[in-house]
């Protein structure tokens, strides 16, 4: 029988969300995504410690920031040996509110990849979907540097990314689900509030519909999944980035996967575009408590993991 993973691949580009690249071969994803937390997790495993140690050894007298950039490239180049498509490499979350430094970091990462023999067409630079991050993406895209906009929790963020010409967005599903489930407390009913009614699933569906209605070329890649149900509800989304644990569950399942999203069967189409000037963006984002809280939390978590990675590096000097 055809596995759920193979069925999903008929409708959606499957992406692996991991720094643990030794797991990639068995799932045959097209692309891969990484973030500071995944890289931190990977370098603490015995299989990947040699990459960290070699990178530190080769650049012992350089700044920690310099070494982290080389570590990200080391992981990215290894991942690209195992997949046919693109890898996403994330800009330090501590630059989330600094447009110029985000631009500089994006350019530097691309330069390092190209020096390692990797063309920029295989790289996506990940930036937080803050106003400043979106402005950085707008500049980088015009230079032929493709961007993946992450920590995206709202339609206004998605609309701003599309207007800026971002290559791809990563609207989060699981973290939205977490927020609403926590808010509901004892009133949460998984049978009623999950599946197609999952607030994270509904958010991605709304963004997908908005993009297809107005003809935006920006790719939609659902991210941050908690369950295979969330993934299956978004079959047909342009791309879905999935952790190895959930890829394995899909591979072991023979459940039927039907296409849920298609440009040809859009429902609840929006009547007009979202206003995207800076004041409107900031007000609309502020007006949505979940998106505001989850964006702030996500930046804090990624920034904290960057600091932990710095400490690991400094301990090896």
UniProtKB/Swiss-Prot annotation:
A GO MF term: transaldolase activity
PROSITE patterns, per the entry: TRANSALDOLASE_1, TRANSALDOLASE_2
KW Cytoplasm (keyword) present: yes
Compartments reported by the entry: Cytoplasm
Enzyme class, UniProt record, top EC level: transferase
Reactions accelerated catalytically: D-sedoheptulose 7-phosphate + D-glyceraldehyde 3-phosphate = D-erythrose 4-phosphate + beta-D-fructose 6-phosphate
Record-listed E.C. numbers: 2.2.1.2
GO CC, alphabetical: cytoplasm
Subunit note: Homodimer.
Family matches, as NCBIfam families: PRK12346.1 (NF009001), talAB (TIGR00874)
Protein name: Transaldolase
């Amino acid at each position: 029988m055809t596995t759920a993973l193979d069925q999903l691949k008929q409708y959606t580009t499957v992406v692996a969300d991991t720094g643990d690249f030794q797991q990639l071969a068995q799932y045959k994803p097209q692309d891969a995504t990484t973030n500071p937390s995944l890289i931190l997790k990977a370098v603490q495993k015995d299989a990947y410690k040699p990459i960290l140690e070699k990178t530190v050894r080769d650049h012992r007298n350089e700044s920690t920031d310099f070494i982290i950039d080389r570590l990200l490239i080391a992981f990215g180049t290894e991942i690209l040996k195992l997949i046919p498509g693109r890898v996403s490499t994330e800009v330090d979350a501590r630059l989330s509110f600094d447009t110029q430094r985000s631009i500089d970091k994006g350019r530097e990462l691309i330069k390092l990849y190209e020096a390692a023999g990797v063309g920029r067409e295989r790289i996506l630079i990940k930036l937080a979907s803050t106003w400043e991050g979106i402005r950085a993406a707008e500049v980088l895209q015009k230079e032929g540097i493709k961007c993946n906009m992450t920590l995206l929790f709202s339609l206004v963020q998605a609309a701003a990314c599309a207007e800026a010409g971002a290559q791809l967005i990563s609207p989060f599903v699981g973290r939205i689900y977490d927020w609403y489930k926590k808010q509901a407390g004892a009133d949460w009913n998984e049978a009623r509030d999950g599946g197609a009614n999952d607030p994270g699933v509904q958010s991605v569906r709304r963004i997908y519909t908005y993009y297809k209605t107005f003809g935006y070329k920006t790719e939609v890649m659902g991210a941050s999944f908690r369950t295979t149900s969330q993934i299956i509800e978004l079959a047909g989304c342009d791309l879905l980035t999935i952790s190895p644990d959930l890829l394995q569950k899909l591979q072991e399942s023979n459940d039927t996967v039907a296409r849920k999203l298609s440009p040809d069967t859009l429902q609840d189409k929006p009547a007009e575009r979202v206003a995207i000037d800076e004041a409107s963006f900031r007000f609309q984002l502020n007006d949505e408590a979940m998106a505001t809280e989850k964006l702030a939390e996500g930046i804090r978590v990624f920034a904290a993991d960057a600091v932990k990675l710095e400490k690991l590096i400094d301990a090896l000097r």
